[in-house]
Design a protein with these regions (language model features):
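C-terminal amphipathic/interface module of NAD(P)-dependent oxidoreductases
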Residues: 1, 11, 265-289
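N-terminal Rossmann NAD(P)H-binding glycine-rich loop of SDR-like oxidoreductase domains
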Residues: 4-30
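SDR active-site strand-loop-helix element
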Residues: 16, 40, 65-69, 106-111, ...
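Adenosine-cofactor binding site in Rossmann-like domains, unifying the SAM/SAH pocket
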Residues: 35-55
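NAD(P)H-binding glycine-rich loop region in Rossmannoid oxidoreductase-like domains
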Residues: 50-87, 100
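Catalytic helix-loop patch of NAD(P)-dependent Rossmann-fold dehydrogenases
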Residues: 86, 91-94, 114-156, 161
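NAD(P)-dependent short-chain dehydrogenase/reductase
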Residues: 144-192, 196-205
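Mid/C-terminal beta-alpha module of Rossmann-like enzyme folds, strongest
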Residues: 202, 209-264
């Protein structure tokens, strides 16, 4: 692998999936000048087109890859299994082959949904993944491949990502609440949450952490905000904050329901909380709320 310490003045970082909520946040943030981030669209770099991938690499002399690209529609993944697998697993294989050929590492972004079948409390990086839906299965398969393929690769697991861009639970609830609709919300799924903005702004420090982390065998990081919650509690907070903004009460009912009372195509974990090593992150100037 290239010694990234020698490239500190001019590291070229390829970010796949740059049009997603994290990628767009990353493009908005002014980052360290010594990192040059590339956010190619699918016409110039596509995980399903090896020729375009090779051309882009040769042209831009990439030193590190951050793979944000993923098929993330959990319910639709149960239907479009082939497309989901092509992006989340086969695409990662192609990316890994490209990285290996060019002697660069990959920071693979993954998910709490690699867990699901065992509801045995908060999951640390040593817990064995056991996905309960097809999306989680493809992400777990890509994790295994990334870790086993090269010692230069690192996996970062996020959970229930929310932010300004894209579609996410918080934005959906805001729309329903502002439309004065009563809402039934699941209350028995224990979750962690990751702010897209907090993750994006800390990517330069995560790259610093990456340089050291690849020296160890446990090349997995959990990255979430502090604390745990559930979707019902999150929805109540959203309503409270909206009432403060518009300065009036919102007269709707938010009803707590059980997972068994909600119909969906894909199963969701009852407990996908992630244990985060905040002390390790703080050693690299990553301080999470």
């Amino acid at each position: 692998m290239r010694d990234l310490a020698k490239f500190n003045e001019n590291i070229n970082v390829l970010v796949t999936g740059g049009s997603g909520q994290i990628g767009l946040d990353l493009q908005d943030i002014k980052l360290k000048k010594n990192y040059n981030f590339f956010f190619p669209d699918s016409n110039s770099f596509n995980l399903l087109n090896k020729e375009k991938m090779d051309i882009f690499f040769e042209k831009n002399k990439i030193d590190l890859i951050i793979n944000l690209a993923a098929y993330t529609n959990v319910d639709q993944a149960e239907i479009d299994r082939e497309l989901c697998k092509n992006i989340n697993f086969k695409g990662v294989i192609s990316l890994s082959e490209l990285a290996k050929k060019n002697e660069v590492g990959i920071i693979q972004i993954s998910t709490d949904y690699v867990f699901g079948k065992n509801n045995d409390g908060v999951k640390n990086i040593y817990h064995k993944p056991n996905p309960i839906n097809y999306y989680g299965y493809t992400k777990f398969e890509s994790e295994k491949f990334i870790i086993n393929e090269s010692n230069n690769n690192l996996v970062i697991r996020l959970a229930s990502v929310f932010g300004f861009y894209g579609n996410n639970f918080i934005k959906t609830m805001m729309k329903l609440i502002l439309n004065n609709q009563d809402i039934n919300v699941i209350s028995d799924q224990k979750i962690s949450m990751t702010s897209s903005f907090e993750f994006a702004k800390n990517i330069p420090y995560l790259i610093d952490l990456y340089k050291e982390k690849i020296e160890f065998t446990d090349r997995i990081i959990h990255f979430t905000n502090k604390g745990y919650t559930n979707w019902f509690e999150v929805t109540k907070v959203i309503k409270d904050e909206l009432e403060k903004i518009i300065n009036k009460k919102i007269l709707i009912n938010i009803n707590a329901i059980k997972s068994n009372d909600w119909t969906s195509i894909a199963k969701r974990p009852l407990d996908s909380r992630l244990e985060v090593n905040f002390k390790e992150l703080e050693n690299f100037n990553i301080f999470l709320p």
